[in-house]
Amino acid sequence: MTDYKDTLNLPQTDFPMRANLPEREPQTLARWQTLDLYRKIRKDREGQPKFILHDGPPYANGRAHLGTAFNKTLKDIVVKSKTLSGFDAPFVPGWDCHGLPIELNVEKKLGKDKLSANAFRQACRDYAFSQIELQRDDFQRLGVLGDWQHPYLTMDFGYEADTVRALAKIVANGHLLRGQKPVHWCAACGSALAEAEVEYRDKASPAVDVGFEAVDAEAVRQRFGVKNATTRVLVPIWTTTPWTLPANEAVSVHPELHYALVKSELQNQPVYLILAKDLVDSAMQRYGVDDYEVHGNLKGDALEGMQLQHPFLDRIVPIILGEHVTTEAGTGNVHTAPAHGLEDYFVAEKYNLPINNPVDARGRFIPDTFLVGGQPVFKANEPIIVLLADSGHLLHSETIQHSYPHCWRHKTPLIFRATPQWFIGMNKNGLRERALAEIEKVTWLPAWGEARIGKMVADRPDWCISRQRLWGIPIPLFIHKKSGELHPKSPALMEKVAQLIEKESVDAWFDLDPKVLLGDDADHYEKVTDVLDVWFDSGVTHFCVLEKRRELKVPADIYLEGSDQHRGWFQSSLLTSLAIRDKAPYKSVLTYGFVVDSQGRKMSKSLGNVILPADVVKNLGADVLRLWAASMDYTVEVNVSDEILKRASDAYRRIRNTARFLLSNLYDFDPKKDKVAVDQLVALDRWAIFTTQKLQEKIITAYDRYRFPAIYQAIHNFCTVEMGSFYLDIIKDRLYTSKESGLPRRSAQTALYYIAEAFVRWIAPIISFTADEIWQFMPGDREPSVFLTQWFSDFPNAALSGEEEQRWQLLLQIRDEVNKALETYRNEGKIGSALTAEVVLYADERLNAVIATLGEELRFVLITSEASVLPFNEKSKAAFDTALPGLALEINVSEFEKCARCWQRRSSVGQIKEHADLCDRCVSNAFEDGEMRQFA
């Protein structure tokens, strides 16, 4: 048998079938760096409309984990897609560098007490730099393009100085206030915590009912209409923090609730109890009392001003009115310790009650506190409960499990503790109302983000921005020692401090002698040594980065972070921006869910489910991780596991194989010389170009709307269905067997060229390494990188009419039914390959009209050796119906010989003496002018 291999146009390409991403990706990275790709993109896009995705700074501590890898990948997809859309879309990465975790790491390594404050801060700075280098390497290895040589760091001297300037503007605009307010306090940190540093965990706590005795029992009884009685009156409170009782200054009742006077016997003594009417039964059940009488009821506002004796201190406390009182649990009477709770603080403020805080920064009672002096607060619960029991004031005690605030770093329970702190006042100058109004102007993705952050802002207390730590940006203020007022020239003084910090770091403030700035006034002022909350540091990036860097702008087009940032960075950025310039720093905000395992559990060493991005990159490649990130629905929790990553790897392989097919059939195609005019294209090729163009419109729209899973699905389906199992399958015969430079082959190559040009750009934002690798093998002159181009727009006008589109859709369905039937016959051993089969299609008028247009070329669409069509009502006994109404099939094994070149079984094989083992079509294609195709 003659070998006709040399007469075929077999695929050729140096583009490797095996991706070998872990080895090949670093080579691409090196090429990007040699090319200075990021700078080239910036130069190429100069003068184009800006699109700014502002990078929320990750914390400079530890290697990148899967959450931060997911974050940076999504951002990179957005930025690259906007670049392909023609925008100038710079990406300036940043890092959050101050705060407790870095302090703790340095303290652990070097010890805090062994170093001066300045040396300790320098050690923190050095540690943060080392962590930034690690994370920078991790992010670059993921293929994230950005200004990695010039990131913003919140510890850069210039950034620290600008943060002080931002604070100065907030001071000048009247948003800063000082107060002794209760804040979340971590005894282990020795500092206040921000809302975003608080996490809730279950905790076992004592729940006690404590009786406060009315000083004038007779007056109380008379208010309830009870006369001629001598029984004492108790007002029971219910609390899970008995340790706060030394700080009690009042008992709160709700003005509109109804309260009952309940007569009973407790501890073998008659007693009257004042309880919220709705809670009488549950309270008496708790006290183990079945026999009791209700004597009248009053609304809470009638109880205001009644005097009560503190249960163990020589202190008279009033009943006051508070809207925060509920009937969800307890007694309807709320123990009020203004130093240990925000609601307590606010209600006490109305009554001008003292803020009595007996707890120090270490979470211990100050030494002269009655009974519990020097004790840690949680250990003080027990002696207080014992004392209450001994004095007859303890009505009930039990242990309950409840959700309780904990330090995000130490995982230890927090306390509310009143300390002198600096706050951004939510109700000063209408900040809260302006924030709520601005939230409505922002586009929130998903849409529920608006309600979430709106509720948080509506409910949040004043923002405590001060911390008592060493490693941070100072709050450079002077307070008058007598009046407590800020220096009248504070903003101007802060600018001078900012200039010093810009040259010498934050040490300049801590080392500063006040006389340098204040002269003789220095003796009258106290220098503030607190530092700023790290959420303030990162919250003013709009001022310190977006506003200051020439290539950026404010407001940013989008902020993109995890949904936990509704109470973190999104909020701190919004509030500082409004306090400075009275508008939001972003036009839109996109959030994603936490990265969890396949069972919805958080990543944890104890569960053994931690997957490190470095391991994924090392084993599968960054592009597989990027494809996983794009494929996930980020609006909910994002699942990851080895199995899920394997599926991403399989999908990647299909995409790569499609690209390889395209490239391997364009090896001899020169777009300048070989492109076929649209009016000469084979109909199937025109359909393929039109389908590609239509899909591109959908893909670009999906990129614009950040619908990455839809893009992933569209590309995956394109590779496996419309292209992989239909178009590319059909044209193989034409590509391989038609005349090398003949119209049928060049028509197919023209379509493949357009498909490849579009396809490589579609995948570029997602699997960037692979796209740029493909780009190097594409035919024709081109830029050195796909990222220096835009979406492909040089499509010919291959538009199809609605009728033509419908016809091809029907042909897709018909071919699918034929394929299923052939597969069944193959599995049953009735045929070998599809080319051993001859197919008769029995079609109704509608389908017949479509199929008949293909004529002799029907067999090429079905990839069978012979195919014919007959009316549906002429079905033979051997025919069987399909799932497509109006279509039946009959499949027979061809009786003809196989062509040695195209492998089709044709009656013409053996008919041409000089080429007895070839069909007439192959003789024409190999040795004569070649066949012509019109449809397929």
From Swiss-Prot:
Q: Which GO terms describe its molecular function?
A: aminoacyl-tRNA deacylase activity; ATP binding; isoleucine-tRNA ligase activity; tRNA binding; zinc ion binding
Which GO terms of the cellular component aspect does the record hold?
cytosol
According to its UniProt record, which cofactors does this protein need?
Zn(2+)
- Where ATP is bound, by residue? 605
Q: Where is this motif: 'KMSKS' region?
A: 602-606
From the Swiss-Prot or TrEMBL record, state where the protein is found: Cytoplasm
How is the cofactor bound, as the UniProt entry phrases it? Binds 1 zinc ion per subunit.
Per the record, what are the reactions this protein catalyses? tRNA(Ile) + L-isoleucine + ATP = L-isoleucyl-tRNA(Ile) + AMP + diphosphate
Motif ('HIGH' region) positions are 58-68
UniProt main location, coarse: cytoplasm
Swiss-Prot/TrEMBL GO biological process terms: isoleucyl-tRNA aminoacylation
**Keywords annotated in UniProt:** Aminoacyl-tRNA synthetase, ATP-binding, Cytoplasm, Ligase, Metal-binding, Nucleotide-binding, Protein biosynthesis, Zinc
Q: Which residues bind L-isoleucyl-5'-AMP?
A: 561
PANTHER family per UniProt: ISOLEUCINE--TRNA LIGASE, MITOCHONDRIAL, SOLEUCYL-TRNA SYNTHETASE
Task: Extract the HAMAP family matched here.
Answer: Ile_tRNA_synth_type1
Subunit organization: Monomer.
Spell out the family assignment given in the record's similarity comment: Belongs to the class-I aminoacyl-tRNA synthetase family. IleS type 1 subfamily.
**Any idea what job this protein has?**
Catalyzes the attachment of isoleucine to tRNA(Ile). As IleRS can inadvertently accommodate and process structurally similar amino acids such as valine, to avoid such errors it has two additional distinct tRNA(Ile)-dependent editing activities. One activity is designated as 'pretransfer' editing and involves the hydrolysis of activated Val-AMP. The other activity is designated 'posttransfer' editing and involves deacylation of mischarged Val-tRNA(Ile).
Its name, as the record gives it, is: Isoleucine--tRNA ligase
> Can you name the source organism?
Coxiella burnetii (strain RSA 493 / Nine Mile phase I)
